[in-house]
Amino acid sequence: LLGADVVPALAKKLNALAVVTDMSPLRIPKRWVEEVSGALGEAGDSRPLFQVDAHNIVPVWTTSDHHETMARTIRPKIHARPDFLGDIPELTPNSAGTALGKANDWKKAQASLDLDLTVPEVKWLKPGAKGASDNLQSFIDQRLKNFADLSNDPNENACSHISAHLNMGQLSAQAAVMRVKASRRHPDGVKAFVEQAAVRRELADNLCFYNNNYDNLSGAAGWARDSLQVHASDEREWTYSVQELEEAKTHEDLWNAAQLQLVREGKMHNFLRMYWAKKILEWSPSPRDALERCIFLNDKYELDGRDPNGFTGCAWSVMGIHDMGWKERPIFGKIRYMNYAGCKRKFDIQ
């Protein structure tokens, strides 16, 4: 990972015409870009620094100039820009070649990063560009037909399973949407996929780009923040420590199963991710603790963790981001409620 202490000297050594960086709306990567920009300026370097939003289909600053509060407000803005689904040009090789002067010291590179190496790697998902492409194709061939109707049932294998590839830059959302649309099969599935991969995903980036408090209660709408505060001291029938949650030692089998899948596989079904976070709100000493725990566990174990979608999912579940007020009840206040009985009605929990 090249930072402000490396980039100016490297750009000078390579006689680069410009420095180009990707875009992430999250706080830490945004700070990295600011630090590199500042270092170039301090070094008296006149090379321009370009930031390209390859994270989204439509650049986040092009879609909207403010925080969008609902999917329905950003949806027409995304669909109004089909020009961003134009053909991706073939990469033209340059004459520099790929030979390296010396082998990279990957252990040194890894040691320079703040990583939690206690979480074991998983085997079920093949990484890299080829693994991502193969996984997307298997979705188109086998699961797209059921995506619209069955993707909310954890018992069905109807999800795309590409969120980790998108998160790690092994697959672009633009390429994924274009390939799914080009399949010309299962129009309901295609529509549902575009909603998730384009509208919902870019709504998450919009939140993190324009709301600096995307990971704390200050980022909530007034109605949600006030409601949670009113009910912050409500009596909880069940409360658990972070360790008990992490080790899936609660009284509820469904929640424990979801948590165990998260720890063992680095994933959790999308519907259960909502339920999982709602229960953490119900079983934590306070809403602030609940949000911190959701983000901690999500980022530690999810293959698609530390991503705008993850922060937004936690924020939706705990503090009502992109949602409206619901019937007031203990602990949750006006935040949308989910419970075990509702899951039993929706799918076979056994």
Residue spans for each PLM region:
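Soluble or luminal CAZymes and related metallo-dependent hydrolases
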Residues: 28, 128-131, 250, 254
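Active-site-proximal binding-pocket segments
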Residues: 153-349
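Structured loops at beta-to-helix junctions and adjacent beta-edge loops in soluble globular domains
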Residues: 22-24, 52-54, 77, 139, ...
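Trp/Phe/Arg-rich N-terminal binding region typifying the photolyase-homology
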Residues: 1-92, 189, 260, 279-313
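Glycine/tryptophan-enriched, flexible segments
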Residues: 45-47, 59-61, 65-223, 346-350
